[in-house]
Amino acid sequence: MPGVETIKSSWADEVELDYGGLPPTTETVENGHKYVTEYKYNKDDKKTKVVRTYKISKQVVPKTVAKRRTWTKFGESKNDKPGPNSQTTMVSEEIIMQFLNSKEDEKANDPLLDPSKNIAKCRICNGEHWSVNCPYKGTAMDTNLMEKKAAAAASAAVDAPKSGKYVPPFLKDSQKGGMGMRGRDDTAAIRISNLSESMTEADLEELVKKIGPQSKMYLARDKNTGLCKGFAYVHFKQRKDAAAAIEILNGHGYDHLILSVEWSKPQNN
C-alpha cells in the first residue's frame, strides 16, 4: 500500500490558520503621543494595518464634562476602554456654538429704539414718548402743566406789546378794556377741530374748564346719528383765556387724536 504524501504549506499560511482571525488592537504611549495599531480587511479582502497617532494634551473642563466621561459604558461597548472607540465613534473637529438671544438682537438693531434717534418727547413728563401715551395724563402732573401754560400764555398776552411781537387787533382792544357796542365778545371764541365722534359736551367742558371761565360752548353733532362732527366752538369770558387755550390745546393729544385749535372766524352780519 503506497504511503500518503503530505504536502507542506508555507509558514505564513500556517500562522494564519493557527490564529484564525485578525491580531488584537494595541496601544502604546510614548513622548506625549498615543499610538493605536489595529488590523482590518480592505475591499480586496486583504489584511491591512492601520496606525493612528493621538497627541495627548491636558485641558481644564467643567465638572459635569469630567463626570460624564467616567460614566460606565453599556450595550456592545460595555467592555470598551474610557474614551471614544474608533469603531463606533468618529471624532471630528470641535465646533464652538454661541447662543444669542434673538429679542436682544432685534432691539439692538432697531433704529427706533436708539436714544439718539428718538424724536418723541412728552409735554407732560418730558419722557421719550408721545403725550397721548403718557401714563401721567389726567393726573396732578398734567393739571399743573396746563395751569402753568395758561398762566404763561396770559402773561405773554399782556406783555406782548413790550416785546415788539405782532399782536392781533382784538388783543389790543382787550388790553384797553370793554367790548364796545357788541353784546357778546366773539373775539374770545376758539374753534377746536379733529375731535372724535364719541366727544360729548361733558368731555368738552372737562377739556377747557381748567384754562378759564367760558360763556358758551357748542359741540357740532350730526342730525341723523347724533355723533360729533369733529369740531366745537368755545367762547371764553376773557380773550387772554382764549389765547391760553390755543397755546395749550393746539397739538395736544386727546382720545388718540391730535387737536387743532385756532381763533374762531367772526360771522358776517
From Swiss-Prot:
SUPFAM superfamilies in alphabetical order: RNA-binding domain, RBD (SSF54928)
Matches recorded under CDD domains: eIF3G (cd12933), RRM_eIF3G_like (cd12408)
Subcellular location per the Swiss-Prot or TrEMBL entry: Cytoplasm
Domain RRM: 188-266
GO biological process, one term: formation of cytoplasmic translation initiation complex
Entry GO CC: eukaryotic 43S preinitiation complex; eukaryotic 48S preinitiation complex; eukaryotic translation initiation factor 3 complex
Entry-linked PROSITE patterns: RRM (PS50102)
Entry function: RNA-binding component of the eukaryotic translation initiation factor 3 (eIF-3) complex, which is involved in protein synthesis of a specialized repertoire of mRNAs and, together with other initiation factors, stimulates binding of mRNA and methionyl-tRNAi to the 40S ribosome. The eIF-3 complex specifically targets and initiates translation of a subset of mRNAs involved in cell proliferation. This subunit can bind 18S rRNA.
Subunit structure: Component of the eukaryotic translation initiation factor 3 (eIF-3) complex. The eIF-3 complex interacts with pix.
Name used for this protein in its record: Eukaryotic translation initiation factor 3 subunit G-1
Native organism: Drosophila willistoni
